[in-house]
Amino acid sequence: MMTPETLASLAAIAFASCWTPGPNNAMLASSGATFGLARTLPHLMGVALGFPVMAVIVGLFLGEAFQRSTLLQEGLRWGGAVLLLWVAWKIATAGGMGRAGSAPRPLRAHEAAAFQWINAKAWVMAIGTAAQFVRAEAPVTSALWIGGVFVVAGITSALGWAAGGAALGRFLATPARLAAFNRLMAAMIALGVVYMLAG
């Protein structure tokens, strides 16, 4: 069982890391603006539930192995960078076609959940929280607490970013405005990749 102080610390980290800009939030905002909140819900749930599942698994099994393997770290770093740049390109080139129905469909829940495993920010969050909050005397309980807190933080932040994008979608109803917004979201992802590679 976590102490109230430890739980408060975990919650602060979870909410701060889930609400700050990153690939998931940029993709959710872009999807909300392009497809609307209702069509973005599967994507939203994939992110909100996919990361906590990942965090529990990392907390129980993978965190220590990942911390010890430079090859795994570099593989994720560069593989994740390439994939995130591809995602940024797809968002940037989606332009303003979403309202006309010719844009690609929003992500499905299982696709958004799978994306967490190649998202560098997700790995940093999962390993960091595992290192700080998984206790050797109660690893399963600790990992489940981490997962539970991230479910709450993830649902609220994913909903906030997708709803924000959907609200902006009304303003972005013209193809030129939507294209500009999608390019801005793509630029946020690309800048995050540059920051990740520089760090």
Predicted segments, located by residue:
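Hydrophobic/aromatic residues within the transmembrane alpha-helices of Major Facilitator Superfamily
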Residues: 15, 19, 52-53, 89, ...
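Membrane helix-loop-helix hairpins that form the core translocation module of multi-pass transporters
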Residues: 38-108, 164, 171, 194
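Juxtamembrane boundary at the C-terminal end of a transmembrane helix
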Residues: 5-6, 194-199
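Hydrophobic/small/kink-forming positions within alpha-helical transmembrane segments
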Residues: 48, 52, 56-57, 124, ...
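Interfacial loop-to-transmembrane junctions
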Residues: 163-187
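Selected transmembrane alpha-helices and immediately adjacent juxtamembrane segments
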Residues: 115-126
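Juxtamembrane transmembrane-helix termini in multi-pass membrane transport proteins
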Residues: 2-74, 128-146
